[in-house]
Regions:
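Active-site phosphate-binding/coordination module
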Residues: 29-130
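Solvent-exposed alpha-helices and their adjacent loops that cap or buttress functional pockets
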Residues: 2-4, 64-65, 151-153
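Non-catalytic pre-domain segments flanking phosphatase-related domains
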Residues: 1-14, 40
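Short beta->alpha junction loops/turns
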Residues: 24, 95, 164-165
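Short alpha-helical
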Residues: 26, 54-55, 166-167
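Asp-based phosphoryl-transfer active-site loop
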Residues: 8-25, 47, 102
């Protein structure tokens, strides 16, 4: 048994959407003040999200994570960055050969596919309401490319498929069968 006053936390990990941020995707003044206070006390703040790293940077800047040595855990944990040193602490990327397969399957199921560079969202097969929302939430411009697999010639941490829920669920089931444990679907 322990009392509240005897607990010693050294690190706080926060999900972004609906936890750290409100419905407007903003950090409230009260939350910001509390997080600044704990950082001043030497605690470390980690921002954790499925968002891409560039989509989290503005929140990290607002909380001054670079000053206090906080971290960004992005792409559902596939990349971890020390904000103070800019060191990439962990980086798991998709196998390059999986990009073509994912693109082909997205086309087969009639759903969108996107990935991320350091500065933009890259669309593989057209705009839809879901990838428009992804761009808005992450505050990133969108670049639509003709040949998605060919364009993605650099390491990526995540591809996201977008579309109507029924189609996504069907694709998810088939992709899990296809990739097994090789990819997190």
């Amino acid at each position: 048994f322990t009392t509240k006053s005897s607990l010693r936390y050294l690190l706080i990990v926060l999900d972004l959407d609906g936890t750290l941020t409100n419905s407007k995707k903003e950090i409230t003044p009260k939350t910001k003040a509390a997080l600044m206070k704990i950082q001043e006390e030497g605690k470390i703040v980690v921002l954790a999200s499925g968002r891409p790293t560039p989509g989290i940077l503005h929140l990290a800047d607002e909380l001054e994570l670079q000053k206090y040595g906080g971290y960004i855990l992005s792409y559902n944990g596939a990349k971890i960055i020390n904000c103070k040193t800019k060191e990439i602490v962990y980086n798991k990327t998709l196998p390059q050969e999986s990009i073509q397969v994912l693109y082909d399957k997205a086309k087969e199921f009639g759903i969108g596919i996107l990935s991320y560079s350091e500065s933009e969202i890259i669309l593989g097969n057209g705009q839809d309401q879901y990838n428009e929302l992804e761009a808005k939430i992450n505050r990133l411009p969108v670049k639509e490319v003709e040949n998605f697999p060919e364009y993605i010639d650099f390491p990526v941490n995540k591809c996201l498929m977008t579309g109507e829920p029924e189609k996504i669920l069907k694709a998810q089931e088939k992709l899990r069968e296809l990739f097994g444990e090789k990819l997190n679907i």
